[in-house]
Amino acid sequence: FSIGKQSDEAKKIYQIVLEAQQKTIEAVKEGVNGQELDRIGRGYIEDAGYGKYFNHGMGHGIGLDIHELPNIGRTYEEYMKAGQIITIEPGIYVPGVGGVRIEDDVLVTKNGYEILTDFSRDYTEV
């Protein structure tokens, strides 16, 4: 959701981030590595022309601490294992326009994933 009315560009950014996240989540499964997951979402954002405004990793593991391994980023070569819980959280931050980050918690399974977060991803201005 957004507080207040947003520009058309901000709404476009929201849609790009959402689609990048969805494409990344669809690739989650045991045996994929953090670099590949990052490459999928980051590539989508870059292809949309906003690559220079995405300046963090795609996500990370969560467990006893909120930030744990595995990392979902450009340099993480380890492979996802079934049973791990990770975040997928792309974001775009454009000066003078605003920033969007959409984060969901995802369980890695042998053949795919299960989204653990239960929150609407519909764009809403409040």
Go through each PLM region and give its residues.
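Active-site neighborhoods and metal-handling regions in enzymes and metal-associated proteins
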Residues: F1-V126
